[in-house]
């Protein structure tokens, strides 16, 4: 992340770690960094120049950056992975979204962190017949529900029946009030 800062690439912490900063459960996997879709190449070049191995998987909404394998602290440990997302829930990331990030100290590093609402929107928009893990979402929503803009979430996810089902579930469980 220091390479992105030094090179002037706008970015923010997203995904599970951003929700953790907001009070959600601690994530157990990779770190998600969000960049504007217009800055993909600049971000990839910045991270590669800093010594990270950049890979472009078949998914068209992210690239992956792996830290130096020697940074692993355990013999069988995989190198640290950073997913660099430029689309959230199918929507291109724009600079105005990154402008909503606030700086926090996360594990000893000052970093911009996206607010919970756009992250939850992306998670709900990603629900489908192939991925529909309500249990993980329930844990997050219970922890950060007061920080979420439910009107904005409902509006942004109204075209996804899986998101609608999740919103109905959390209303019926009285995790949130009626929308």
For every predicted segment, state its role:
Residues 1-179:
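Compositionally biased terminal segments of proteins
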């Amino acid at each position: 992340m220091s390479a992105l800062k030094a090179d002037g690439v706008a970015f923010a912490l997203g995904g599970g770690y951003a929700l953790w900063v907001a009070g959600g459960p601690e994530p157990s996997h990779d770190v998600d960094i969000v960049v504007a879709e217009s800055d993909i190449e600049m971000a990839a070049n910045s991270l590669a120049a800093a010594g990270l191995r950049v890979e472009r998987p078949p998914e068209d909404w992210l690239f992956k950056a792996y830290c130096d394998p020697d940074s692993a602290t355990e013999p069988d440990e995989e190198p640290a992975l950073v997913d660099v997302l430029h689309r959230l829930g199918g929507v291109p990331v724009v600079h105005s979204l990154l402008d909503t990030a606030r700086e926090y100290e996360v594990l000893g590093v000052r970093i911009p962190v996206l607010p919970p609402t756009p992250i939850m929107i992306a998670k709900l928009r990603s629900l489908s017949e192939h991925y529909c893990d309500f249990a993980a979402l329930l844990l997050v929503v219970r922890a950060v529900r007061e920080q979420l803009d439910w009107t904005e979430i409902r509006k942004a996810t109204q075209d996804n029946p899986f998101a609608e089902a999740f919103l109905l579930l959390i209303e019926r469980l009285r995790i949130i009030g009626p929308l």
